[in-house]
Amino acid sequence: MSKPLRILYAVGPEDVIEAYNYWIKGLDAPSQVSVTFSSQFYEVCKTLDAQGYVIAQSNKFEKVQDDRFIIERRPVPWSPGALYHLRQIYCGLSLLASALRFRANVVVADSGTTYWFVLSLFSWLGITVIPSLHCMLWCKYLPLRLVDKLNLSLSRNLFASDCKAILVASQDIAKQISQLTCGKHQPILEFFSSYRRSDFANIPEPSPPSPMRVLFAGRVEQNKGVFDLLEIAKGFATEGKDIIFDICGEGSALEPLRQAAIQAGVERSFICHGYCSKPQMRSMFAQCHVVIVPTRTDFIEGFNRVVCESILSGRPVVTSAVCPALSYVADAVVEVPPNDVQAYGDALVKLLCDRQLYEQKRLACQVVQEQFYDPTKSWGAALKSILLT
């Protein structure tokens, strides 16, 4: 582009100020196992001598500014029911107003920051748009609701013509874009989450499984399958199986899940740890034998970084095709049907009892993990390549 780049980046609930404060010191934020997307954005702006304006969703307002960046965390009000749709449109219009005040000539917008069709307004006003999709456009196992059909219909033009290129976290997302646009869309660039090899160096091989430890990491929500895990744990306790579940992460279901485990009398084998920092997560990956990702069909999973982190830690994964990451690491995964609680439990027992299968899956982790260390496949590298064309 001939004009100096002025890029607005709209991101979800990432702590972009924490990431910035560590980035300027040449460090990664300790709150995330992967390299944050905002720190990759800062690096791209620095490399291209661009001005950057980062707006993240938050529960409180914060702002920092220097010669190159304006970085804000903006509160997003909770809006139930139909008000949610109005809020999403309002958030998009608010981003548009900020982009105009900043005199942005490029806007990069993540999933969830507004409805996709609102971004066409930016394009009509001469601002280059780069949508960054971390989630599926719709739940691939469920029928579309009327409101979803309307939203997608309105969003078709953005992907077909009103953007410069499209960043996607998986091929499953790319396929949905192609389906939505009947194959007539702007260039699609796939990216992986980025990891430092040093963060996974010297993680020991799994100890003998006595007890077997199963790790869940991520948002603690019903649609992430956490209550399915509790049902499995209750069944294992009744059968006397020596299997412990470690639940790591925050979410609206954390306290209800913890209380349900106590009421069921399985709190010693179903441990809710809450939020865990990067060093704590390293310890959790090191002590576990298997990582489980039981996302249910009513969640629009885009990839699931925990699958990457499990593979990089040398731990097999149990998951279903709801998780698009499966196709990238299939040799290191035991696949089960979506939402099948019994099948998840059976898969864990099989890995516990069949040492040959477990070793086969564990060794496969070493084969498939290299793709996640490739810097040319990072979000930042994909964004930079778009900006340079």
Residue ranges, per PLM feature:
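Nucleotide-activated donor-binding/catalytic signature segment of Leloir-type glycosyltransferases, i.e.
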Residues: 258-276
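Conserved acidic donor-binding segment of nucleotide-sugar-dependent glycosyltransferases
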Residues: 331-342, 350-355
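Donor nucleotide-sugar binding/catalytic pocket of nucleotide-sugar-dependent glycosyltransferases
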Residues: 156-202, 272, 302
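Membrane-proximal helix-turn-helix segments that form the acceptor-binding/catalytic region
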Residues: 38-43, 93-100, 146-166
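A conserved mid-protein helix/loop that constitutes part of the nucleotide-sugar donor-binding site
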Residues: 36, 212, 216-235, 252-255, ...
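Short hydrophobic beta-strand element within catalytic cores of glycosyltransferases
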Residues: 312, 316-319
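Short His-centered aromatic/hydrophobic patch
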Residues: 109-115, 133
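Acidic donor-binding loop of glycosyltransferase active sites
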Residues: 286-300, 315
